[in-house]
Regions:
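C-terminal accessory domains and tails appended to enzymatic cores
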Residues: 1-132
């Protein structure tokens, strides 16, 4: 009975997370950049919307903020828009110099994810990437 109770609780949290992502999308002033206050499971939900290009959310392990590319569809590894080529593989000061964002921390070589130390920094990077 305890196992069943735990599974029901997990399902409730999962549906609450889905609702939180839908709410963030609905309330986003810019539908191309969706900011989540927690690291929710967002990929299948936002890939089914037309507008989102990037999602900004906290990294629950490091405290950094993540800028993640939204995929063309939930089963694809193809992003709608990649982060700028000039950011690829850059870290710390090298990334700060190219972005102008003081707390920029990292951009993956494949340009599908980047990080900053603040939500504001991550959103600024997402806006720059959108215009690139």
């Amino acid at each position: 009975q305890m196992v069943l109770k735990k599974e029901i609780e997990k399902a409730q949290y999962f549906f609450e997370d889905i609702e939180s992502v839908k709410k963030a999308y609905k309330e986003a002033p810019d539908k191309q950049i969706i900011v989540l206050e927690h690291s929710y499971p967002w990929k299948s939900i936002l890939s089914n919307q037309k507008e989102p290009m990037f999602v900004v959310h906290p990294d629950q392990n490091t405290g950094e903020w993540v800028i993640a590319c939204v995929r063309k569809n939930p089963r694809s590894h193809e992003n709608r828009k990649f982060l700028p080529a000039s950011w690829a593989g850059k870290k710390k000061q090298a990334l700060v110099e190219v972005t102008g964002v003081p707390d920029a921390e990292f951009c993956h070589n494949k340009r599908f994810i980047a990080k900053a130390w603040s939500k504001e920094g991550a959103v600024a990077m997402a806006r720059l990437a959108l215009r690139a």
